[in-house]
Amino acid sequence: MDWILPIAGIIAAIAFLVLCIGIVVVLISVKKNLDHVAKTLDGVEGQVQGITRETTDLLHKANRLTEDIQGKVERLNSVVDGVKGIGDSVQNLNGSVDRVTNSITHNISQNEDKISQVVQWSNVAMEIADKWQNRHYRRGSANYRNTSVGNDANHSNENYTTNVEKNF
């Protein structure tokens, strides 16, 4: 039985050696995987740095573009304000024209009879003026001695009447 102990020690040593070899194999495999992961991370780090540079450049461009757009919007606001002012002025002008038109229409409708009388009296005045001119012209001509007031009446056959329609 004395021999069992050394054999058990040898078996334990062999088992320990196999265990160590297994651990070494596993550690070598883990080292290869870690080396591969390290290389992948180095590649990812380079890509992240490139993406970071591109992102920074894009942010700078976006900031410049935003500033440019803000400047243009501010200038455009003054144009829009000017157009709004013109629109307000045109609207005020339209309101004034409407008020004046309504006032004129109202005054015409109130003074319709007076306007009709003025037109009739102006027609009478024009007839009298024409007769006066005809008489004055005849007096100045050589045939004045042959004409009489009766002839003046014969020459007044011209009709100077004017009809005024009341469409107000």
UniProtKB/Swiss-Prot annotation:
Q: Where is this region: Disordered?
A: 144-168
Alphabetical list of InterPro entries matching this protein: UPF0478
Record-level GO cellular component terms: plasma membrane
Topology relative to the membrane, per the entry? Answer: Single-pass membrane protein
* Chief location bin: membrane
Subcellular location as annotated: Cell membrane
| Keyword terms | Cell membrane, Membrane, Transmembrane, Transmembrane helix
Instruction: Give the residue spans that cross the bilayer.
Output: 7-27
- Protein family membership: Belongs to the UPF0478 family.
Per its record, how is this protein called by name?
UPF0478 protein SH1183
Query: What organism, scientifically named, is this protein from?
Result: Staphylococcus haemolyticus (strain JCSC1435)
